[in-house]
């Protein structure tokens, strides 16, 4: 009888094998799985760094991303101390820094969902300061009610449908609820997102939801459930790299303007804040129609010209020729080529120049610099 109780039911084995629970989450002597989660996160980071990124593919580097934040009553849960809301806000702040470092010509908009309704918190912008200030206005007391996936997707679709065909349109949902209360058929909304080539991804904070899994599968997005705050940061980091562009997307030449950041002395209003005064005395003047903008990259609403800075385009170019993954090798003696630290145990060798680097330098080169000092 004791052996049967330990084995459990037959149908449980299928789920355990599919999720590799027995291999990933192993309890320690005290019955905790924190060490197993930390090891899983570290192994995932190592695997991502050692995986060679595909080359010679079309990438959607002009990204327009709507981030949907679940602000239902489930966000106040203490499952991730101090609360899921605090953990998500901190992770989003870090994600914004990394996102715009990797995607300098991208834009992000914010949507909150509570009381079965979705509201736009921030319109599409490339100004990270505006996005962070908007996040700081949210408090845990703001959370309440239930989550509605359909209303969130419909509002995101309304904000993305007017974007030009050559941009990558994406939705990233952060969901804490275990259910969604929708006014209609959610699968018809998912079909609409698929038809409009809007890539929908989700990060769960509770357990896996079948409808989110089907949404990600239909729209070629990603869906994962966070195990702890560190794992949540890892899941967010997966969305910093630009996705591959669909074959059906437009690939025409784009007319681009390069305005200068200058002090504006004449009295004027900006097209991004038509109802209020400009947020700064400095701004960007559209090179085609002369409209004032507070920040770039942006698409001028007057003449539809794409406005960017030359350094932003240069930084976006690195995704077209990414730094190849280094080969992990066993090292008994020698020094790291970059920081000259003595190597012992493992090293990472560049496939082009055959020079060996330590773990810290390998991480720095692939996540920040994107160039090999030995090859250059």
Curated annotation (Swiss-Prot):
- InterPro entries annotated for this entry? C1-like_sf (IPR046349), Ssl1-like (IPR007198), TFIIH_C1-like_dom (IPR004595), TFIIH_SSL1/p44 (IPR012170), VWF_A (IPR002035), vWFA_dom_sf (IPR036465), Znf_C2H2_type (IPR013087), Znf_RING/FYVE/PHD (IPR013083)
What are the record keywords, sorted?
DNA damage, DNA repair, Metal-binding, Nucleus, Transcription, Transcription regulation, Zinc, Zinc-finger
Record's Gene Ontology CC terms?
transcription factor TFIIH core complex; transcription factor TFIIH holo complex
Per the UniProt entry, what are the Gene Ontology biological process annotations, in alphabetical order? Answer: DNA-templated transcription; nucleotide-excision repair; regulation of transcription by RNA polymerase II
From the UniProt record, which GO molecular function terms apply? zinc ion binding
Spell out the SUPFAM superfamilies in the cross-references: Cysteine-rich domain (SSF57889), vWA-like (SSF53300)
Question: What is the role of the protein in this entry?
Answer: Component of the general transcription and DNA repair factor IIH (TFIIH) core complex, which is involved in general and transcription-coupled nucleotide excision repair (NER) of damaged DNA and, when complexed to CAK, in RNA transcription by RNA polymerase II. In NER, TFIIH acts by opening DNA around the lesion to allow the excision of the damaged oligonucleotide and its replacement by a new DNA fragment. In transcription, TFIIH has an essential role in transcription initiation.
- Family per UniProt? Belongs to the GTF2H2 family.
* Protein name, entry field: General transcription factor IIH subunit 2
Q: Which organism is it from?
A: Caenorhabditis elegans
Gene name tied to this protein = gtf-2H2C
């Amino acid at each position: 009888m004791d052996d049967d109780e330990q084995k459990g039911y037959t149908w449980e084995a299928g789920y355990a094998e599919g999720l590799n629970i027995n291999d990933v989450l192993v309890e320690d002597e005290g019955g905790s799985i924190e060490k197993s989660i930390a090891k899983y996160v570290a192994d995932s980071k190592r695997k991502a760094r050692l995986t060679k990124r595909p080359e010679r593919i079309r990438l959607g580097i002009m990204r327009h991303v709507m981030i949907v934040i679940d602000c239902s009553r489930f966000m106040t849960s203490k499952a991730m101390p101090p609360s899921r809301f605090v953990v998500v806000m901190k992770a989003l702040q870090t994600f914004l820094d990394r996102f715009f470092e990797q995607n300098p010509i991208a834009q992000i908009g914010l949507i909150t969902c509570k009381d079965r309704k979705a509201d736009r918190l921030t319109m599409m912008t490339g100004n990270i300061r505006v996005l962070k200030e908007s996040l700081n206005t949210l408090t845990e007391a703001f959370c309440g009610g239930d989550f509605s996936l359909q209303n969130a997707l419909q509002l995101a679709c309304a904000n993305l449908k007017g974007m030009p065909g050559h941009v990558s349109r994406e939705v990233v949902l952060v969901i804490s609820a275990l259910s969604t209360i929708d006014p209609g058929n959610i699968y018809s909304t998912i079909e609409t997102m698929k038809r409009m080539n809007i890539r929908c991804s989700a990060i769960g904070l509770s357990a896996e939801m079948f409808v989110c899994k089907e949404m990600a599968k239909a729209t070629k997005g990603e869906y994962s459930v966070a195990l702890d705050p560190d794992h949540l940061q890892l899941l967010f980091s997966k969305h910093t790299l630009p996705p591959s562009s669909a074959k059906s997307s437009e690939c025409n030449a784009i007319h681009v303007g390069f305005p200068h950041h200058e002090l504006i002395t004449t009295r004027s209003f900006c097209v991004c804040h038509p109802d209020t005064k400009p947020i700064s005395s400095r701004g960007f003047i559209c090179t085609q129609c002369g409209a004032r903008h507070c920040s770039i990259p942006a698409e001028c609403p007057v003449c539809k010209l794409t406005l960017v800075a030359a350094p932003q385009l240069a930084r976006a170019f690195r995704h077209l020729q990414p730094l190849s993954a280094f080969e992990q090798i066993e090292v008994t003696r020698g020094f790291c080529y970059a920081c000259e630290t003595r190597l012992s145990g493992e090293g990472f060798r560049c496939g082009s120049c055959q020079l060996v680097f330590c773990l810290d330098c390998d991480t720095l080169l692939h996540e920040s610099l994107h160039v090999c000092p030995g090859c250059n």
